[in-house]
């Protein structure tokens, strides 16, 4: 059975790019969200195997959403994706429970490496 993934990014183009990489490699994208608040709702609704989460988004940022999802499901597997290679953001995300961090613009193999490492 394919692993079920939730993609969270406020940019439709980024969601499309990540979805394309995942679908071509046998993953099932169960839902997409464009902000952190939507991400929390979609997580509750779909219970995905993994979440790719942008950090900078309107309404609720990715780190806040990460913390809220972790309160719902301590075992949640979340990979942060962000153009900000800022050390403090990476540290905040990892301390909040993120499993990995991908810096945009990313290569498909880096996305797959992070996802496969997190799922196994």
UniProtKB/Swiss-Prot annotation:
Effect of residue 54 to A: Lack of phosphorylation. No chemotaxis, tumbly swimming behavior and shows exclusively clockwise rotation
UniProt keyword Lipid metabolism present: no
GO cellular component entries: cytoplasm
This protein's UniProt keywords: Chemotaxis, Cytoplasm, Magnesium, Metal-binding, Phosphoprotein, Two-component regulatory system
Any one GO molecular-function label of the UniProt entry: metal ion binding
Record Pfam families: Response_reg (PF00072)
4-aspartylphosphate sites (modified residues): 54
SMART domains recorded: REC
Response regulatory domain residues: 4-119
Modification after translation, per record: Phosphorylated by CheA. Dephosphorylated (inactivated) by FliY and CheC.
Keyword Nucleus (UniProt): no
Cofactor entry: Mg(2+)
Cofactor comment text: Binds 1 Mg(2+) ion per subunit.
Gene Ontology terms: biological process: bacterial-type flagellum-dependent swarming motility; chemotaxis; phosphorelay signal transduction system
Cell compartments where the protein resides: Cytoplasm
Chain positions recorded as Mg(2+) binding sites: 9-10, 54, 56
Annotated consequence of substituting residue 54 to S/T: No chemotaxis, tumbly swimming behavior and shows exclusively clockwise rotation
Biological function: Involved in the transmission of sensory signals from the chemoreceptors to the flagellar motors. Phosphorylated CheY interacts with the flagella switch components FliM and FliY, which causes counterclockwise rotation of the flagella, resulting in smooth swimming.
Assembly and interaction partners: Phosphorylated CheY binds to FliM and FliY.
Other information: The signaling mechanism of chemotaxis in B.subtilis appears to be inverted in comparison to E.coli.
Protein name: Chemotaxis protein CheY
Taxonomic lineage: Bacteria, Bacillati, Bacillota, Bacilli, Bacillales
Gene field: cheY
């Amino acid at each position: 059975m394919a692993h079920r993934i939730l993609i969270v990014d406020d940019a439709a183009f980024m969601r499309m790019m990540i979805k394309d990489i995942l679908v071509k490699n046998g993953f099932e994208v169960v839902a997409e969200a464009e902000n952190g608040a939507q991400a929390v709702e979609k997580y509750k609704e779909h219970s995905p195997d993994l979440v790719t989460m942008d950090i900078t988004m309107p309404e609720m940022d990715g780190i806040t959403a990460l913390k809220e999802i972790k309160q719902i499901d301590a075992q949640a597997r979340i990979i942060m994706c962000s153009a900000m290679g800022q050390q403090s953001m990476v540290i905040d995300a990892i301390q909040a429970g993120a499993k990995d961090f991908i810096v945009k613009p990313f290569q498909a193999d880096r996305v797959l490496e992070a996802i496969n490492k997190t799922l196994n």
